[in-house]
Amino acid sequence: MVAPTPTSALLHSSTMVKAGVFLIIKLCPALGNNHAGTMAMFVGGITFFFASCAAISQSDGKKVLAYSTISNLGLIVCCAGIGSYEAAWTAIMIVIFHAVAKSLLFLSVGTAEQQLGSRDIERFDGLFNAMPHLCLCMVIGISGMFLAPFGMLISKWAAMKAFIDAGHPMLLLLLVFGSATTIFYWAKWLGKILSVMNGQERREQGITKGEWFTLKTLSWMTIIVCILFPLISSYGVLPYLRITYGFTRDVIAQSNLIIMSLMVVLLVI
């Protein structure tokens, strides 16, 4: 993880690491009910679980994000290996949600490193006092990765449904335990940056307008993608799936959408 942070944000959130899984998603209909799909399912599921476990032992912010990326790529491959309509929808939505939230986190870590001289999460104590606006950007990015009602949780909800409908309880267990494992490192990160320490001086003066523009744009994109995900699904994902599978239907029931809408309202309040 020695590349400049903007390069890491570009390569490890939305371009290089997504190139391979993009091809696997394109092959998703052909992977259903065969040995290649079964291998992809279990390799992806095991990768998701063990990469999540590996992230717990890391304190370098970029390494935590790197292992988290590997974990989510494993989940995408696992969903694509199932080959079902619901699993394909889930894989595509994970790609979208992950791209914006993880880009925000990589750039936030880079900005913190520039101001603090370190990207070690253990040294992020009191970031809320020293750089409150940057801290807010990090909170939004972390929330986008694992908290309700942000995008990744929506995708994992849909993944659970896809695994159950496909009759793969072992994959469901890997998803549940792997998702539970992510709580450890994201909660640790949140606890560090939200801790309040008296007497710290403000350090945001050195952050340029260009950096703020990028961070705030990605923060709003993380929120907007979550709120507008039904429209993204209806006008972006479902037309592709209609061409690929020949039919469309709702992956997440209307009642669940209402629950998620209430979560958004409570979050705003």
Q: What is the predicted role of each segment?
A:
Residues M1-G206, K216, I227:
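Hydrophobic transmembrane alpha-helices and their helix-loop junctions in integral membrane proteins
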Residues N129-C135, W186-I269:
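Cytoplasmic/organellar membrane-interface segments at the starts of transmembrane helices
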